[in-house]
Amino acid sequence: MHSVLTKDMEANFRWHLDQPILHSLTIKDLFEETVLNQHLARLMSDFGSPTRAHAASMTAKRLGYGAALTIYARIKHEVLINPIDCTFMTVAEESTKTSWLPIYSFPVKTEGVYQNTVDWITKDLYTKSLVPLVELLAREKGISRVVLFENIFTYMKW
């Protein structure tokens, strides 16, 4: 099961397996103000985001892509995922997957208490993870909650 999942995720998505990492950040880390500030500053300095609002928008898109991956893994492979343990990483230049786009990872667990998928999406993914992060990102001047949710939803719908 683990092998099928990892092969599927790596073949079809930007999913991490043994790539040299330059920078990594879990969703849980973004709830810390200093880490979030460093992350937004890094998107501006290293990736050319012109403003913190733009960097917040980029972050929402990355969160949306990660959410889509977790939903896919949950439905297709019945993986138990705590959304805040998901990680997005910038790979090092010597990696075979070097790109400005992050790659993603999350702990693969298939045993434990299984919650109904709709409840998991509603409670764990949306209410406990995405909504509070949008609230934090929306504090940036020049970006609205609507735009941030739209950025997340675009990837989840995809």
Model regions: which residues?
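Generic N-terminal leader/targeting and pre-domain segments
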Residues: 1-58
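Hydrophobic, aromatic-lined core segments that form the binding pocket/scaffold
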Residues: 33-158
